[in-house]
Regions:
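Long, terminal "pre-/pro-" and other extracytoplasmic accessory regions
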Residues: 1-227
């Protein structure tokens, strides 16, 4: 019948739709992702789940489940939030961000318990727990400007850059922020592309690279306007 024919035609998926269905089969469910998330962030009863979404990242990495919880009490002037994203394929935590005005205000009345070195150890311990394999492939990259003019830093951030074959990979890193008063991890994100890296064989030495640069680029003195 015509109806049967129309139903059959409607059921035919485009190549893009077929690809999307196949991809979706690889993804963990919302409930599975939520269970993983709650292993790494403590969500108290006061929080309300505001958003839960599955999205695809722009840089070609896997899709992620993202969750956000909020707490807001205008009468007490209290505000807090927690957000976390979980890789929908590998089940790894991709990012964490959290803030609680109550804890923040209380801690600032005292003195920081964590200096930079103690905070760095807390960051390294956290990375060893949440992303051990990736952390083992990184190198700490100090920020020379971090809190240089701050008497009592509220937090410290630490950046660990990915290295492959002894070579740094810009844009691939693990970053952690530690509260200097409590030692709590308040921010974490992982930028880590799934790439095949070529072997570092038969590379030019640094001197040969400089020689090639200067031989092929014509340098001239110029007057320029400095903005």
């Amino acid at each position: 019948s015509d109806n049967a024919m129309m139903a059959k035609e409607a059921a035919v998926l485009t190549p893009e739709e077929i690809k999307e269905v196949e991809n979706t089969k690889k993804f963990i469910t919302r409930e599975q992702a939520l269970e993983i998330a709650k292993k790494y962030v403590k969500v108290e009863d006061k929080y309300k789940l505001e958003a839960a979404s599955l999205y695809t990242d722009y840089n070609g990495t896997n899709a992620s489940w993202s969750f956000s919880w909020n707490y807001n009490n205008p009468e007490k002037n209290e505000y807090a939030y927690i957000s976390i994203s979980v890789d929908a394929v590998t089940k790894e935590v991709r990012s964490i961000s959290k803030y609680d005005s109550t804890t923040d205000n209380a801690s600032k009345n005292g003195n920081p318990e964590y200096d930079m070195e103690k905070s760095k150890k807390a960051a390294e311990k956290f990375l060893s727990m949440i992303a051990p394999e990736k952390f083992a492939q990184t190198e700490y990259r100090p920020d020379i400007f971090q809190n240089s003019n701050v008497e009592k830093p509220v937090s410290y951030s630490f950046n660990f850059v990915r290295k492959v074959n002894g070579i740094s990979c810009p844009g691939n890193n693990l970053n952690v922020t530690v509260n200097a008063y409590t030692g709590e991890i308040t921010n974490f994100y992982s930028n880590w592309m799934d790439l095949e890296f070529p072997k570092a064989d038969d590379l030019l030495s640094i001197d040969a690279a400089y020689e090639a640069l200067y031989n092929n680029v014509e340098f001239k003195l110029k007057y320029i306007i400095h903005y």
